[in-house]
Amino acid sequence: ANLSEQYQRGDLENLLALFDASAHMERGDKKQIRAEYGELFRNSENRALYIWDVAWSGDGKLTRGEGSYQARVLRKGDGSPQIRSGAVTIEVIQRNDKPLIVGLYHKADY
């Protein structure tokens, strides 16, 4: 299953399994990724993540994808979802023949 599927399911452990131990995002390391997505999943009824128009480039070790994203989150008790969209960068390495995310960065347009 991919990042968007685990995000939509709110499956924290399987989402985290897509990330390498050394993974980072804007606000910190894998511990921060766990904390932020855990809070989001606990406090939302419904989520969707769309990523498209990704252009991939790589140097053999690191593969970088740059594209667009939209996240829709319906928080518990809210009547309508919050929608954020913008640019996303995903950095991936191969470890034991498995792709793992080492960087996930997004910039919302609001």
Language-model regions, residue ranges each:
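Surface-exposed, charged secondary-structure patches
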Residues: 38-85, 89
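Hydrophobic pocket/interface hotspot
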Residues: 3, 15-16, 33, 92
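Solvent-exposed loop/turn segments at secondary-structure junctions
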Residues: 22-25, 71-73, 107-110
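Exposed acidic/polar residues on beta-strands and adjacent loops within beta-sheet cores, strongest
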Residues: 31, 55-59, 108-110
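Short, charge-rich amphipathic alpha-helical segments embedded
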Residues: 26-35
